[in-house]
């Protein structure tokens, strides 16, 4: 689980710190606040920055999963636009990658600006971008990116260990592509309330299946809701 930009908006009963405490109480929860990596006096930005290491039965590290809080809005709240992964979070992430030196995945809510950059290049026929699956379904090919200077993706490219990025945020986007050695993927959506009229839209609805094979290869596939709902469930 990672936080998005709506979890603690005006009128919310809990802030992220309080929600994190609730989520961490689950019997099988692996979620943690991830705030005090350096010290309680100087916590890194956001709530829920942590790593889940997938290992084999001998304890060998197979795949690190890095979860990050991409935060909510800038200092002016809604009027300042979307926030982003902050520099201290980026530095922390690169530290964790360097400690492990194993190809890793990152999960966070809001897409990096380079996702839009790659899409625009792909439309112009730039072969440095490799299309994998999905589409941009948002009106006017919208990407809900921050207006703050980007840095996370560039640092990840320079680092070399982050190979897969997964995000959400833009409910109708399902695009997956490879750019500068990193595969960026929008997860499919399951909401029926996010946008006006979204309950009647279906192309974006479903799940994203991530499979790590025994040889280390990763498969990422769309699982539309129509493929998992039987005719009996639909009442046919």
What are these regions (language model features)?
Residues 1-100, 192, 205-211:
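Extended active-site neighborhood of metal-dependent phosphoesterases/phosphodiesterases
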Residues 17-29, 123-127, 174-188:
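Short, electropositive alpha-helical surface patch
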Residues 38-43, 164-166, 198-201:
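Short linear motifs in intrinsically disordered
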Residues 51-59, 152-159, 171-236:
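Binuclear metal-dependent phosphoesterase catalytic core
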């Amino acid at each position: 689980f990672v936080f998005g930009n709506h979890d603690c908006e005006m009128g919310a009963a809990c802030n992220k710190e309080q929600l994190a405490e609730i989520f961490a109480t689950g019997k099988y929860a692996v979620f943690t606040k991830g705030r005090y990596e350096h010290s309680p006096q100087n916590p890194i930005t956001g709530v829920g920055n942590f790593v889940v290491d997938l290992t084999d039965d001998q304890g060998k590290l197979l795949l690190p999963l890095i979860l990050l809080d991409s935060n909510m809005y800038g200092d002016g709240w809604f009027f300042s636009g979307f926030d982003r992964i902050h520099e201290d979070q980026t530095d922390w992430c690169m530290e964790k990658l360097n400690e492990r030196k194993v190809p890793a995945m990152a999960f966070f809510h809001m897409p990096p600006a380079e996702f839009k950059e790659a899409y625009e290049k792909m439309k112009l026929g730039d072969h440095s971008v490799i299309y994998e699956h999905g589409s941009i379904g948002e009106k006017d090919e919208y990407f809900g990116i921050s207006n703050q200077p980007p840095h996370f993706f560039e640092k990840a490219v320079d680092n070399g260990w982050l190979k897969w990025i997964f995000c959400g945020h833009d409910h109708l986007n399902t695009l997956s592509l490879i750019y500068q050695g990193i595969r960026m993927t929008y997860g499919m959506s399951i909401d029926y309330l996010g946008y006006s009229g979204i309950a009647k839209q279906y192309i974006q609805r479903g799940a994203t299946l991530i499979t790590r094979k025994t040889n280390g290869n990763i498969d990422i596939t769309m699982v539309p809701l129509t493929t998992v709902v039987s005719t009996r469930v639909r009442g046919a």
